[in-house]
Amino acid sequence: MCGSFLRRVAAEESRHPTPVGRLLLPALLGLRLVLLAAGGTGVFGGGEEQSEFVCHTQQAGCKAVCYDAFHPLSPLRFWAFQVTLVAVPSALYMGFILYHVIWHWEASEKVKTEEETLSQGEKGGEASRAGSSRLLWAYVAQLGVRLALEGAALGGQYHLYGFRMPSSFVCRLEPCLGSTNCYLSRPSEKSIFLKTMFGVTGLCLLFTLLELVLLGLGRWWRIWRHKSPSSNYSPTSQSAKRCKAPTDNFPVVEIRERPGEAGERGSEVPLSARP
């Protein structure tokens, strides 16, 4: 029972997504997690990065204020928050699939006999089609939310960090005395990683948009095929009609003899048998 339930969940989950949504989007999400776990902690480590942020001043509190102005939000925490937000719509969609499968599972358990199944077959088919339509629109909605989140993340990353990390930063905030020059460690490495994460986010945005376009084209194609007159043509039905057509050119004539005529014909004696 558990195996069939899991197969049903997997079938419902893979019914509407195209290969882009089924393979590429999860792969890019996994790539983000690997990049953050393998490289992000080493490149943008919180304690080490702040300790390597050097300012030409001995004024108390100046270095902390300048570092806060340079990095209002740590890039590593920003990307972790972004991945969490992007994964929320997919998690909600999976929860909706589980609810849909459990609801249909309980409804099918209520059907006890074959007669009830046959009598309710049409209603069950309508309910299944309605459920499939709800799953499709739920999938489209979660793709739309993901598209908005990816676009907001790209804009936020560009606003906070730009495309490259500068090697120096001029700070003019209190309690610093005048302008203070501060220097960042490994700016080239940080710039490369920043552009990599920007590119991965851009690919996720592009593939999410492509998935929506493919879903729209697929739905339009199904509607066009359903309305097309040629789709109603069936060679089997046409051949069946030809086989069942009456043969008017060769009518069948049925001749019946009357009982009286049959008796008279049987009572006649041939001429050769007469004396």
UniProtKB/Swiss-Prot annotation:
Region (Disordered), start-end ranges? 254-275
Topological domains on the Cytoplasmic side lie at: 1-22, 99-134, 218-275
Residue ranges in the Extracellular topological domain are 44-77, 156-196
Q: Primary place of residence?
A: membrane
Q: Where are the transmembrane segments?
A: 23-43, 78-98, 135-155, 197-217
User: Which Pfam families does the entry mention?
Assistant: Connexin (PF00029)
Topological type in the membrane? Multi-pass membrane protein
- GO cellular component, as recorded: connexin complex
- UniProt keyword list: Cell junction, Cell membrane, Gap junction, Membrane, Transmembrane, Transmembrane helix
| MF GO annotations | gap junction channel activity
| Single GO BP term | cell-cell signaling
UniProt-annotated location(s): Cell membrane; Cell junction, Gap junction
Give the compositionally biased regions (Basic and acidic residues). 254-267
- What SMART domains has UniProt attached to this entry? CNX (SM00037), Connexin_CCC (SM01089)
Q: Which PANTHER family does the protein's record reference?
A: CONNEXIN, GAP JUNCTION GAMMA-3 PROTEIN
> Which family, according to UniProt?
Belongs to the connexin family. Gamma-type subfamily.
Q: What does this protein do?
A: One gap junction consists of a cluster of closely packed pairs of transmembrane channels, the connexons, through which materials of low MW diffuse from one cell to a neighboring cell.
Partners and quaternary state? A connexon is composed of a hexamer of connexins.
Q: Protein name, please?
A: Gap junction gamma-3 protein
